[in-house]
Amino acid sequence: MIDKRDFKAFKLVSKYAPSGDQPQAIETLVDNIEGGEKAQILLGATGTGKTYTMSQVISKVNKPTLVVAHNKTLAGQLYGEFKEFFPENAVEYFVSYYDYYQPEAYVPSSDTYIEKDSSVNDEIDKLRHSATSSLLERNDVIVVASVSCIYGLGSPKEYADSAVSLRPGQEISRDQLLNALVDIQFERNDIDFQRGRFRVRGDVVEVFPASRDEHAFRIEFFGDEIDRIREIESLTGKVLGDADHLVLFPATHFVTNDEHMEQSISKIQAELADQLKLFEAEGKLLEAQRLRQRTEYDIEMLREMGYTNGVENYSRHMDGRSAGEPPYTLLDFFPDDFLIMIDESHMTMGQIKGMYNGDKARKQMLVDYGFRLPSALDNRPLRREEFESHVHQIVYVSATPGDYEMEQTDTIVEQIIRPTGLLDPEVEVRPSMGQMDDLLGEINLRVERGERTFITTLTKKMAEDLTDYLKEMGVKVKYMHSDIKTLERTEIIRDLRLGVFDVLIGINLLREGIDVPEVSLVAILDADKEGFLRNERGLIQTIGRAARNADGHVIMYADRMTDSMQRAIDETARRRAIQMAYNEEHGIIPQTIKKDIRDLISISRAVEAKATEAETNYESMTRSERQEAIKQLQKNMQEAAELLDFELAAQLRDLILELKAMD
């Protein structure tokens, strides 16, 4: 078992002090957690600094914390913010490592088998390994995750028990170490030294842990004893220092020892025999032949290599679980007394609920037609009630908590006051008759003042028609639809802020996570059409997009007042009254947020430009110039990785290797 380091407290680093009603929110949340409250809601209005409040709570309760977001983009933003707040602690990132993923499936109507096809992002895989190893080695850990955290991951006990612990002076032969590394799925490659690999040079073994991307370790032997362990730069071999202890975790999360492997294979064979009998009794000879061929091949691979493609489908046997028992997930790597924070909980909890059913429907088809054993159904995401069983203490964070969260707890901590003094916007309702001309007049007013406008519609056709109409009227406008990729979306938001265009039209893209202080008008068309996009929560989230500007204003175009509209307007007015009273009492004049227009796109392009320049000129460089270029590229590679632009980081890494090969 791995001995954790001495307890280290979380240390929050920030130039800001809590303000507005952050202090009371922080104090109440902390008191409730320390008092044993299982669940509570942080109801924080848009722009009130919920992430900062979360960070303050984590630093005061000093518990390992899992922060769950509903998509990779939001998880990436939170990861960056927590890294800034906690530079001395372990802040980790755990999302799906697939850049592309086509799950294994079978379509009976056309007799089409779709083989699993995927592209794994090496950088995210490294970050996942970093998260699990940190959780087993230390206490001061924050993991920011997507709903990937409820998917099967392999047994934390097997993962920890398989780890190889090394110290100077330890009696172990070089060959014993090599065998131990192979057992935990490290691959020997004396030429191409990458994560999850090792190389051997005489009495020196160099190992590249799966959780690192720059630093490797050099283990020097004297006979059958470790003489010294040194940390080195993986690219240059430069020695960074000596280590008095090294723990090497497996290169894959699905790992088991030889004894357990044989037991697992016996169980797989027994299940195969039972399923073959069932198919033959039902006259499904094709399915029986298919299942026998596939499973026996996988068994042979497991025996010889300890691994096979799709090994996760046998995880129930390898983990020693019973049928129907939940899989091990990231949650099992945390200690019992850990804290969960669910960001944008009204979205995230819905995702957690929905993952299981979709996964089961697809896998059941594979089982019925002989592509997989029934135990493959137990390689699955957790059900919501199974997720709940892992909860020791939880904080739901949202401006608009969902029904589920409200059912879980009566403890609601409000954070309504913005540190900037900004108020929730005024909301007015206007008739839909003549709305185009009315809206055009409002847009022109904002353009004259150098401000921006958001317009949200209900249908794609209406968004397209409105875009065409406004263009004809001379308005600089863009329509952001669901086919636009994340990076393009970031670029569109940046262009809106820069004034490349003045109006952005969308359907469901104008709610969570879009921060544009220049927007002073939000127009909601068809506000009286009740439904997912026009319910109370959807309307409050959309109204919140105008809450970062001192002149924020919202116009709902509708022919009648629905209950959802009334509740959204009343809640906004309630918050606005609280904020105005606070400002008056403290002599605060609301100021529009001044936020630098600096984002992933612009920085990535600057880095990419430097990379392209270096690539164009490096052949004519002197050796010393090349060394300087390498240093700059390594810095750029780090910047790209920190921005989660892993594709660019990989390109820069390859360019660095080319430059080094020239010397």
Curated annotation (Swiss-Prot):
Keyword Nucleotide-binding recorded: yes
Positions of ATP binding: G44, A45, T46, G47, T48, G49, K50, T51
One GO MF term attached to the UniProt entry: helicase activity
Chain ranges for the short sequence motif Beta-hairpin as given in the UniProt record: 97-120
Residue ranges constituting the Helicase C-terminal domain according to the UniProt record: 435-601
Pfam family, one: UvrB
Keyword set, alphabetical order: ATP-binding, Cytoplasm, DNA damage, DNA excision, DNA repair, Excision nuclease, Helicase, Hydrolase, Nucleotide-binding, SOS response
Quaternary data: Forms a heterotetramer with UvrA during the search for lesions. Interacts with UvrC in an incision complex.
Record-linked PANTHER family: UVRABC SYSTEM PROTEIN B
Family the UniProt entry places it in: Belongs to the UvrB family.
Protein's recorded name: UvrABC system protein B
Organism of this sequence: Streptococcus equi subsp. equi (strain 4047)
UniProt gene name: uvrB
